[in-house]
């Protein structure tokens, strides 16, 4: 609650509680008075309520905005509040008093705030007055009551101000100043003089603050510092002009006091001065001595003329010291004596009321003014100002006397003159459909007062404000004061639009309390205006009322909302801003008794009535048929009371002596002419008049107040004779009879005993009858409706309860949450059914249900007392309880015991089968048992389970430790553990695992013992399987390490054998390589070959069902555990392999016989036709493209000798599947295999292969031991030795010559040159002769890696010594054993790989023999470019020997083993062939070579790779074949042609035919080469700058990317591979476009730039001996070929 300030008003406003708010539905909203009647019991407790219509109910605003003009009222806010107005009236009286005393009131300022003189006066008066407060020294307490802090001298200051300002006024009010005015005696005078001398009051003008109060109250208050402070402070000057809003007058500050004084007549100090004064003439007076007239009216003396004051009102004279209180000095203004002052102050004041504004507004102009005022006052937009802030500010302003805020309010504007805000059917204009709906609505305020149920509908006169709505246009702070409606009727207010309207209401029961509080707090106002609250001009702070116990409620009415006030409910409020509202009164039937009470109240207050209440009642009774039944009943009651009261009054008047009476129709007399002169009540039934004044009349309540004439002279005027009143009453009773009958029936039915109760149907009929006849909704009506509603509700609940009882199973299964009745509720429900005012059919069934519940309770108690819970019995009780559909307290307990019983059943069932008693099951049982309610049986079972679980877990953990132990436990220990755990009645997985591990260990040990005790060793697969099975067994197996070591040794042997035999990334397994081939004749990739092999196998199976698969030797080896069977299978596969190879060779050799259809024949692994260079496999005799297979590697191919082509033995990848290790290596593997106690399929296959190889070796040695072959081998050896020696000697001479040239350039060494030459030569010769068996070192840069050689040819270069030593036939067959020269300048083409060096020796020997010289010499010829003649073979063998050797060679090549005998046989067979015989094909296609003699760098990468591959083949095979290359290049435009060396004569004949055409074509080619030589030179220079040339390596047969210049090998046969700065290139201009190092071909940089270079190959083609050839160019003729190249051409 807010605190109350010193003046009695709240310091800070606290909003009261909110009133109820109702939101009717559309159905409820259709009948407004019925809805208000239903909410009246709740809403009348707060006096006011708010109704929110449905959202869609929005009536249009029907006022004419443009023509709506009104004049508002002016409201000064601080004059509205009662207590503030009392203070202002007090200050007016005080200011008027001092003005009449010739002084201006100055209100002091104490502690920086204006002193509240009214509060000071009241507080001092409450403490006994000035004298007592001063005597008892209570001024400090007075200051505390005023809110001042003690201890600052405030008490003395307040005393001074009170004594100077209020004390004279107090004396005046008490009448002391008038005492003795007519008693002039000397004693009084002396007393007064003494008092003056003792008091001597000196006013302090510095402290004073003037407040100029004009004759009319202006409510302006000036502070003490106005005169000086305002002038100094500019802000205060502004505040004088601008207030808070357009109508604010400003602060309570007046203009500056005028300093001019009013000229006054002073009393002179001597008589002579007195005659000089100008006196006012009086009419009717004599001219006498004026000095005699001036005597003091108090003391009667005329002395002390300077102290005599002349009154400006009556001209009486008074000494200043004779006045009470005495004046210290002569006043400056007009002065009046106490007598005149009393006369002036006692004049009656005008009644307070609102003034009308001068300006007339439209809605727009008023809205603009209102919005501007609010926005300026709060300094923010109007819509942003909170309602709470406006509310607090309003109550602060109305309680402030310092701030004078003026607002305007357009109130009480009659809608009859200005139009209603609701649509109204007046016939002036056609209405829209939506407007017509609202025009007929009962909530339309034009219709509500005249509704059928409304009492005001029976008043014909349009009462403005009651039947005719009033309009209200408000602005911020405009307010309506505390009031109640006329005749205490209802009121309803609708806010059409705008900002909210704040309401405060007090309920009717507190109306008199509010009036008493206001009289108590503002008695001065009620003394002059007893009916002040009916004038709507007084407001009081709700907090003050609440402080005094008056209940106050509030609400904010927003646009579109109704506010209803109830009879005699005081209400007030204010507007938050600009808005438009409409209000009207209405009266319902329940108002009639209240209206009668209001008229009696008005009679006591002598207040005028708006209409005659008696006339209204009798008017309704006169036409009872048109009355509503409820209204008729209420009228009947009121009419009965009025009849009785009227009969009593008339009888009392007759008894007083009135004898005359006369009937008069009072309704025809105007209301103001039939008012009682005593109480002002409008008379209708009767009145009393007198002949002395016929216009004057009184009611029968005041018969004596009419006049003093005797009663016999007075006349009783009446409207109805007394005998007519019962007939009127009877008519109303007949109308209300049906209602009375209904009331009696309802009352009897509702109060009937149990045995005589009506049925529910009868009560429904009564209720429907009341609703149809529209009986009033009184207590009986509501009681009947509530009874029917209660009975229906009970019937529904009973029906639901009984239906759920029947459907308990379905409802329990649904799982939905339902609220059941408790037993207490069921009992209460049965009691409620019994106490119903009617009977329903389900009562007996509900009673039976209660009996079942009680029976269930007894049986449940017995079941819960059992020692061991019985699940079946408990389940039956639970089903019974669930079927009752009642919340039974025993049911949860029964469910708990059922869970316990089921858990015990589950435990017993589980323990009965130990196999089901797992750890998880026990844990789950324990966990589920822990959640059960405590029970001794459950606890016992839990203890047993826990013990069993603990023991089981202990054994499980022990078994787990044994299973995971490292090292493993022995079998004996584990058996003991298993035996001990047998007695535990539980399922133990770890113990079972341990038991299974023991069983597996026994089985595994038995298998191992069986294998070890067998006749044969076990296969590796068996041991691996045993090892894999025994390793995870968690038992210590004594035999397992032995088995694992055997497996590891066998695997190591197999891996070693695989590294020995298998190539890198080989697609064959070791067993396939060691076994005879089954895929002979199958070509393609790995997948295709395997598929074809399977097809062959299927075909073989169809031919011979008993024949095993060719490719499944390994399966045979694995299946054949007997050694003899393994050997038999191997022999069978061996024979099939040889037969298949014979067939394949025959088929491949047959391809050469179909030259005419050679384009249709498929070759190579790609199975395409012949093209490009092609190689022939020496084993399968098929031809292979050089781009499809890897070329055979030769250690001498870097230097490129022309006669090496015969030495190359080519085996295709299909025939040569492995590395083919030497037999010595295989023998070491077999020795290791014999040490293994394990059988391997690979080992047995290796044994078979070794036996096969040794068998073949024996056959080969036997064949080579014949005389014919022995002599052939000897001959080859001699030729090879001689060739090697000659080559070494020539190279040594070259080295010596180079050293001598270097020494010749040094003068110091010239004397030693002869000896140096001789010693060097001797050292070389001796080294050649003394070291015939040393092996040279191979240059790592210029030879292929050993790994590549091993992959390609099946033996290691490092195994050369072993090869030589192992040969028992010819120890000196290999040329690389003869000359131990380590210089890199030695011609390295002589030190070739063992497979081919013998072939080189054979060729050299044959050539030297043909020349008849001891040193190898070239065949004499005219030019180096002239080809030699064809030479015969070196050796010639008999056909039988040759066939035998060829058969051995084929079988030896099938072996995947390197044997020396294969090399011997190969050399012999090669020596039997002519040296010029070709073993390759060269297929020419169209004109791709002849028409493009110069190949540019612009070719794509694929063309470059193809060219590099071609150059590789040419270097390997071509230099010795230059004579035949031209024969192969046959120009056939659209057809490939295959040239075979089978028939040399055919080739020569064809060559002769083509020479003429070829000559012309070559001429054209030479011209094209000369034209493009410059372009080649530019390209060469660019390549030199980049140091990277597109010159392929001769060894890069796979077509890899080009190497850098430093590592590239040129096209020369003896490339020296120069390094870094010596790498300079030159390109052949003869047509082959090959690149050569300048160092390798002896060309300087100047020669390469200025002249053409033609390589040896091109020079051979263009030699002078060739027919039709031009002589070589001068550069070639004068150029000396290097010695190496000349040797190569020999």
From Swiss-Prot:
It catalyses: N(6),N(6),N(6)-trimethyl-L-lysyl(4)-[histone H3] + 3 2-oxoglutarate + 3 O2 = L-lysyl(4)-[histone H3] + 3 formaldehyde + 3 succinate + 3 CO2. PROSITE patterns: ARID, JMJC, JMJN, ZF_PHD_1, ZF_PHD_2. Residues 1337-1346 have a biased composition (Acidic residues). Binds 1 Fe(2+) ion per subunit. 2-oxoglutarate binds at residues 409, 491, 493, 501. The GSGFP motif is required for the interaction with SUZ12. The ARID domain specifically binds to the CCGCCC motif and is required for the lysine-specific histone demethylase activity. The PHD-type 3 zinc finger is required for the interaction with histone H3 di- and trimethylated at 'Lys-4'. This is Lysine-specific demethylase 5A. The lineage of its organism: Eukaryota, Metazoa, Chordata, Craniata, Vertebrata.
């Amino acid at each position: 609650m807010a605190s109350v300030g010193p003046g009695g008003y709240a310091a800070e406003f606290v909003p009261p509680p909110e009133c109820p708010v109702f939101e009717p539905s559309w159905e409820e909203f259709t009948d407004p008075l019925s809805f208000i009647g239903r909410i009246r019991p709740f809403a009348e407790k707060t006096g006011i309520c708010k109704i929110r219509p449905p959202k869609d109910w929005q009536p249009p605003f029907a006022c004419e905005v443009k023509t709506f003009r009104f004049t508002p009222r002016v409201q000064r806010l601080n004059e509205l509040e009662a207590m503030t107005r009392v203070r202002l009236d007090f200050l007016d009286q005080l200011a008027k008093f001092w003005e009449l005393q010739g002084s201006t009131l100055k209100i002091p300022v104490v502690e920086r705030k204006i002193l509240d003189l009214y509060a000071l006066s009241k507080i001092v008066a409450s403490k006994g007055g000035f004298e007592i407060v001063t005597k008892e020294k209570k001024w400090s307490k007075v200051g505390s009551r005023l809110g001042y802090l003690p201890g600052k001298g405030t008490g003395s200051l307040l005393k001074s101000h009170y004594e100077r300002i209020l004390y004279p006024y107090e004396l005046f009010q008490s009448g002391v100043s008038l005492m003795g005015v007519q008693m002039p005696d000397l004693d009084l005078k002396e007393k007064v003089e003494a008092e003056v001398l003792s008091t001597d009051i000196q006013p302090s003008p510095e402290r004073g603050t003037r407040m100029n109060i004009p004759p009319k109250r202006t409510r302006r208050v000036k502070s003490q510092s106005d005169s000086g402070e305002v002038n100094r402070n500019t802000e205060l000057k502004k505040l004088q002009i601008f207030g808070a809003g357009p109508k604010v007058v400003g602060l309570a500050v007046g203009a500056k006091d005028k300093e001019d004084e009013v000229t006054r007549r002073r009393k002179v100090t001597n008589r002579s001065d007195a005659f000089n004064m100008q006196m006012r003439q009086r009419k009717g007076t004599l001219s006498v001595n004026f000095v005699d007239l001036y005597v003091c009216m108090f003391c009667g003396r005329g002395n002390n003329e300077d102290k005599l004051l002349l009154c400006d009102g009556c001209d009486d004279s008074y000494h200043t010291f004779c006045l009470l209180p005495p004046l210290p000095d002569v006043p400056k203004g007009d002065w009046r004596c106490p007598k005149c002052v009393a006369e002036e102050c006692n004049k009656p004041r005008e009644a307070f009321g609102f003034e009308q504004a001068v300006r007339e507004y439209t809605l727009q102009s008023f809205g603009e003014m209102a919005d501007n005022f609010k926005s300026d006052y709060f300094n923010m937009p109007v819509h942003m100002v909170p309602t709470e802030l406006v509310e607090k500010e309003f109550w602060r302003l109305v309680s402030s006397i310092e701030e004078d805020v003026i607002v305007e309010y357009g109130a009480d504007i009659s809608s009859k003159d200005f139009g209603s805000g609701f649509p109204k059917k007046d016939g002036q204009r056609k209405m829209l459909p939506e407007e017509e709906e609202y025009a007929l609505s009962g909530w339309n305020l034009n219709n509500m007062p005249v509704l059928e149920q409304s009492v005001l509908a029976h008043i014909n006169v349009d009462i403005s404000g009651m039947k005719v709505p009033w309009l209200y246009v408000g602005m911020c702070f405009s307010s309506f004061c505390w009031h109640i409606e006329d005749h205490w009727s209802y009121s309803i207010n609708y806010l059409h639009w705008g900002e909210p309207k704040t309401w405060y209401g007090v309920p009717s029961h507190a109306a008199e309390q509010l009036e008493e509080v206001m009289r108590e707090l503002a008695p001065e106002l009620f003394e002059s205006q007893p009916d002040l609250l009916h004038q709507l001009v007084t407001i009081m702070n709700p907090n003050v009322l609440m402080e005094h116990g008056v209940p106050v409620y509030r609400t904010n009415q927003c646009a579109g909302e109704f506010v209803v006030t109830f009879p005699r409910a005081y209400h007030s409020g204010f507007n938050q801003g600009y808005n438009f509202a409409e209000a009207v009164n209405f009266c319902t039937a329940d108002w009639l008794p209240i209206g009668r009470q209001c008229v009696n109240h008005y009679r006591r207050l002598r207040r005028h009535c708006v209409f005659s209440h008696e006339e209204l009642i009798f008017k309704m009774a006169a036409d009872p048929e048109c009355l509503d039944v409820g209204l008729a009943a209420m009228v009947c009651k009121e009419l009965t009371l009025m009849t009785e009261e009227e009969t009593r009054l008339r009888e009392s008047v007759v008894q007083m002596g009135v004898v005359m009476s006369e009937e008069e129709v009072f309704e025809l007399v105007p209301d103001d002419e039939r008012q009682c002169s005593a109480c002002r009540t409008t008379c209708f039934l009767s009145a009393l008049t007198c002949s002395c004044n016929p216009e004057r009349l009184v009611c029968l309540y005041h018969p004596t107040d009419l006049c003093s004439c005797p009663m016999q002279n007075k006349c009783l005027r009446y409207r109805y004779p007394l005998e007519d009143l019962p007939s009127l009453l009877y008519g109303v009773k007949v109308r209300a009879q049906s209602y009375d009958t209904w009331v009696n029936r309802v009352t009897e039915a509702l109060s009937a005993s149990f045995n005589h109760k009506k049925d529910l149907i009868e009560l429904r009929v009564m209720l429907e009858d009341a609703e149809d006849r529209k009986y009033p909704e009184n207590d009986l009506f509501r009681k009947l409706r509530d009874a029917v509603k209660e009975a229906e509700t009970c019937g529904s609940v009973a029906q639901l309860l009984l239906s759920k009882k029947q459907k308990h199973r379905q409802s329990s299964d649904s799982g939905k949450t339902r609220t059941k009745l408790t037993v207490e509720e069921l009992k209460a429900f049965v009691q409620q059914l019994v106490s119903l005012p009617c009977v329903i059919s389900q009562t007996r069934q509900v009673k039976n249900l209660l009996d079942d519940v009680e029976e269930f309770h007894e049986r449940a108690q017995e079941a819960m007392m059992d020692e061991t819970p019985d699940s079946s019995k408990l389940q039956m009780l639970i089903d019974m309880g669930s079927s009752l559909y009642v919340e039974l307290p025993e049911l949860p307990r029964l469910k708990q015991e059922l869970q316990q019983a089921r858990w015990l059943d589950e435990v017993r069932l589980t323990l009965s089968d130990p196999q089901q008693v797992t750890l998880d099951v026990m844990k789950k049982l324990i966990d589920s048992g822990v959640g059960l309610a405590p029970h001794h049986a459950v606890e016992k079972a839990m203890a047993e389970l826990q013990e069993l679980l603990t023991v089981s877990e202990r054994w499980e953990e022990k078994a787990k430790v044994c299973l995971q132990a490292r090292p493993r436990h022995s079998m004996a220990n584990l058996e003991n553990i298993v035996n001990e755990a047998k007695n535990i009645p539980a399922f133990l997985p770890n113990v079972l695992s341990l038991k299974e591990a023991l069983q597996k260990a026994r089985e595994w040990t038995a298998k191992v013992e069986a294998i070890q005790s067998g006749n044969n060793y076990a296969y590796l697969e068996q041991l691996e399987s045993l090892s894999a099975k025994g390793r995870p067994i968690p038992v210590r197996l004594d035999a397992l390490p032995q088995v694992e070591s055997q497996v590891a040794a066998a695997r190591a042997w197999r891996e070693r054998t695989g590294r020995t035999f298998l190539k890198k990334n080989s697609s064959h397994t070791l067993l396939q390589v060691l076994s005879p081939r089954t895929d002979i004749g199958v070509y393609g990739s790995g997948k295709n070959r395997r598929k074809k092999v399977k097809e062959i196998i299927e075909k073989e199976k169809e031919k011979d069902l008993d024949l095993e698969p060719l490719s499944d030797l390994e399966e045979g080896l694995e299946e054949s555990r007997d050694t003899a069977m393994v050997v038999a299978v191997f022999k069978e596969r061996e024979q099939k392999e040889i037969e298949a190879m014979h067939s394949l060779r025959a088929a491949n050799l047959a391809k050469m016989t179909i030259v005419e259809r050679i384009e249709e024949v498929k070759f190579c692994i790609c199975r395409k036709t012949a093209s490009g260079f092609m190689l022939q496999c020496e084993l399968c005799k098929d031809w292979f493209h050089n781009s499809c297979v890897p070329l055979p590697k030769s250690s001498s191919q870097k230097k490129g000798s022309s006669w090496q082509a015969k030495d190359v033995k080519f085996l295709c990848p299909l025939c040569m599947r492995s590395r083919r290790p030497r037999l010595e290596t295989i023998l070491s593997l077999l020795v290791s295999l014999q040490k293994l106690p394990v059988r391997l399929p690979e080992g047995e296959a290796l044994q078979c292969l070794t036996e096969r190889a040794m068998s073949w070796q024996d056959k080969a040695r036997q064949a080579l031991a014949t005389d014919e072959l022995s002599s052939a081998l000897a001959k080859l050896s001699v030729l090879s030795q001689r060739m090697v020696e000659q080559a070494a000697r020539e190279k040594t001479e070259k080295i010596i010559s180079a050293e001598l040239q270097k020494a010749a350039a040094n003068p110091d060494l010239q004397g030693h040159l002869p000896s140096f030459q001789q010693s060097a030569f001797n050292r070389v010769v001796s080294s050649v002769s003394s070291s015939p068996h040393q092996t040279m070192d191979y240059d790592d840069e210029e030879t292929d890696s050993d790994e590549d050689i091993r992959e390609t040819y099946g033996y290691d270069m490092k195994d050369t010594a072993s090869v030589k030593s192992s040969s028992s036939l010819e120890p000196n067959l290999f040329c690389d054993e003869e000359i131990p020269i380590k210089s890199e300048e030695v011609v390295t083409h002589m030190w070739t790989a063992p497979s081919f060096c013998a072939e080189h020796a054979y060729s050299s020997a044959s050539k030297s023999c043909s020349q008849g010289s001891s040193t190898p010499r070239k065949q004499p010829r005219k030019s180096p470019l002239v080809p030699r003649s064809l030479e015969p073979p070196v050796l010639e063998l008999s056909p039988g020997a040759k066939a035998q050797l060829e058969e051995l060679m084929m079988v030896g090549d099938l072996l995947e083993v390197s044997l020396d005998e294969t090399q011997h046989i190969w050399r012999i067979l090669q020596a039997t062939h002519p040296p010029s015989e070709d073993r390759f094909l060269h297929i020419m296609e169209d004109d791709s070579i002849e028409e493009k003699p110069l190949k540019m760098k612009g070719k794509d990468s694929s063309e470059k790779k193809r060219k590099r591959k071609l150059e590789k083949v040419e270097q390997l095979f071509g230099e010795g074949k230059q004579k035949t290359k031209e024969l192969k290049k046959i120009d056939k435009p659209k057809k490939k042609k295959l040239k075979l060396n089978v028939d040399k004569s055919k080739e020569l004949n064809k060559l002769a035919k083509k020479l003429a055409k070829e000559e012309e074509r070559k001429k054209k080619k030479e011209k094209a080469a000369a034209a493009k030589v410059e372009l080649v030179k530019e390209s060469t220079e660019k390549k030199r700058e980049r140091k990277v040339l597109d010159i392929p390596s001769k060894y890069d047969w796979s077509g890899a990317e080009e190497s850098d210049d430093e590592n590239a090998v040129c096209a020369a046969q003896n490339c020296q591979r120069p390094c870094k700065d010596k790498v300079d290139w030159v390109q052949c201009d003869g047509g082959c476009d090959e690149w050569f190092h300048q160092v390798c071909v002896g060309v300087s940089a100047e020669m390469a730039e200025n002249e053409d270079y033609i390589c040896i190959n091109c020079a051979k083609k263009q030699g002078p001996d060739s027919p039709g050839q031009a002589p070589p160019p001068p550069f070639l003729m004068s150029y000396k070929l290097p010695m190496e190249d000349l040797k190569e051409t020999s």
